């Protein structure tokens, strides 16, 4: 029983001028983000309004832009845009043409206030109505990249675990779900009864998810090939096998193993081709390893000094050695590098009574900043281009939700909420790229 409890505890423990124009203006401490209005110059049916609504939602789900839309104006020429009443810095002008096969051609122009020329233009052809959301996310990525210089993330995916009947002795249902970044288009890619699915993590090419689970009474680490649904068990060590994550090149995974029926776990790197192990840590409970973007170091959680904190280890050290990230942090769990390797996002408990929030650690200056303000926020995962963080928030009634926050902490969004205590949402993982 002790090993099972320990296993479960590990699961829980666990363009240059254009860009210059868009530098946010700071006024009395408030960042004024450029306002983008999305309008159509024709409304052939409900399709344009549906697409434009998704574009607006996308452009509000970030830290660099804000957006609205309007159906008041059918603008036939760019000279007729009512800039004064719109109060916009930019207009995304969309024109929809429907053909005999009920498919659409969509023309998109980006216009700037006080500029008589189009900044950018693109056309999407032969779009079926079933691809409405995909089209909208494509347009959003295009607009976001042109107006900020950064990659959009609106065609990325989220993987997460949904647990039904979580407190039942039998009949607990675990589902691994993949959805669009905004929670739409959910697909169950793996379903198990009474065998937990935990800590899913994507491969960098987006083809595989690695996760830990119980099967036949023992823990193991598995890979799921997303396209085929093929599941492969890759570890079968006694005791705890948990918290796997892929290396950037996809050739290795980092994971936590007890290698026996012990409460202590250590971090290992496994070569997926040979199954050879390299040990990274030597004492304490060590878990939740994540590779740095360059693959040269691993960040993880350890309680070796009496309470959980974040440690960093080199993957190239001849002998296991690691160092604490910062003595300023009281307790910390579940670290993740940002894609540029400059920050670490983690679950932070700043005092015994503070609860847990999602925090950002700046590696350059050592500052720690909470970016959420809940009492039970956990499981952060960073978007592939570093702008946003998805995480789990649990309220005082024990209801969990999948939420999103910008890395600066200014923008918060809900993605999915479990509206009763009989469902839990756990372990989100953001895909490494757009699909």
UniProtKB/Swiss-Prot annotation:
Offer one example of a GO biological process linked to this entry: cell division
Q: InterPro entries in the record, alphabetically?
A: 6-blade_b-propeller_TolB-like (IPR011042), PD40 (IPR011659), Tol-Pal_TolB (IPR014167)
Q: Which UniProt keywords apply?
A: Cell cycle, Cell division, Periplasm, Signal
Kindly report the protein's main subcellular placement as a broad class: periplasm
Signal sequence residues: 1-20
Where does it reside?
Answer: Periplasm
* Gene Ontology terms: cellular component: periplasmic space
- Subunit relationships: The Tol-Pal system is composed of five core proteins: the inner membrane proteins TolA, TolQ and TolR, the periplasmic protein TolB and the outer membrane protein Pal. They form a network linking the inner and outer membranes and the peptidoglycan layer.
Main function: Part of the Tol-Pal system, which plays a role in outer membrane invagination during cell division and is important for maintaining outer membrane integrity.
Alphabetized HAMAP family for the sequence: TolB (MF_00671)
What family does the Swiss-Prot or TrEMBL record give for this protein?
Answer: Belongs to the TolB family.
Q: What is this protein called?
A: Tol-Pal system protein TolB
Record the organism.
Francisella tularensis subsp. novicida (strain U112)
């Amino acid at each position: 029983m002790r090993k099972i409890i320990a296993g479960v505890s590990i699961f829980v423990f666990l363009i240059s001028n254009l860009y210059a124009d868009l530098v946010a203006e700071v006024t009395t401490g408030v960042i004024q983000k450029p306002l983008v209005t999305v309008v159509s110059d024709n409304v052939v049916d409900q399709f344009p309004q549906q697409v434009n609504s998704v574009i607006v939602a996308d452009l509000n789900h970030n830290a660099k832009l804000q957006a609205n839309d309007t159906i008041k104006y059918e603008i036939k020429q760019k000279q007729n845009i009512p800039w004064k009443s719109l109060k916009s810095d930019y207009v995304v002008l969309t024109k929809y043409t429907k053909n005999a096969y009920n498919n659409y051609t969509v023309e998109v122009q980006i216009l700037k206030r006080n500029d008589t020329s189009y900044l950018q233009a693109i056309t999407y052809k032969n779009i079926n109505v079933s691809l409405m959301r995909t089209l909208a996310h494509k347009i959003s990525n295009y607009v976001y990249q042109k107006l900020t210089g950064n990659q959009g993330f609106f065609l990325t995916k989220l993987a997460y675990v949904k647990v039904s009947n979580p407190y039942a002795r039998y009949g607990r249902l675990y589902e691994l779900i993949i959805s669009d970044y905004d929670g739409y288009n959910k697909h169950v890619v793996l379903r198990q009864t009474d065998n937990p699915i935990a800590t899913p993590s994507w491969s960098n090419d987006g083809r595989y998810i690695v996760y830990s689970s119980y099967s036949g009474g023992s823990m193991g680490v598995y890979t799921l090939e997303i396209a085929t649904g093929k599941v492969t068990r890759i570890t079968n060590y006694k005791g705890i096998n948990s918290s796997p994550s892929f290396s950037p090149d996809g050739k290795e995974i980092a994971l936590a193993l007890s290698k026996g029926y012990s409460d202590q776990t250590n971090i290992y790197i496994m070569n997926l081709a040979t199954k050879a192990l390299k040990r990274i840590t030597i004492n304490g409970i060590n878990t939740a390893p994540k590779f740095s973007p360059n693959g040269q170091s691993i960040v993880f959680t350890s309680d070796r000094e009496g309470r959980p904190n974040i440690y960093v280890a080199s993957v190239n050290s001849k002998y296991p050695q690691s160092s604490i990230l910062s003595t300023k942090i009281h307790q910390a769990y579940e670290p993740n590098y940002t894609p540029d390797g400059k920050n670490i996002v983690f679950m932070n408990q700043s005092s015994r009574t503070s609860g847990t929030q999602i925090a950002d650690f700046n590696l350059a200056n050592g500052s720690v900043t909470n970016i959420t303000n809940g009492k039970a926020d956990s499981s952060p995962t960073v978007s592939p281009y570093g702008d946003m963080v998805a995480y789990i928030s649990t309220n005082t009634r024990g209801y969990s939700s999948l939420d999103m926050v910008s890395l600066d902490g200014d923008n918060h969004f809900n993605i999915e909420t479990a509206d009763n205590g009989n469902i839990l949402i756990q372990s989100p993982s953001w895909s490494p790229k757009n699909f």
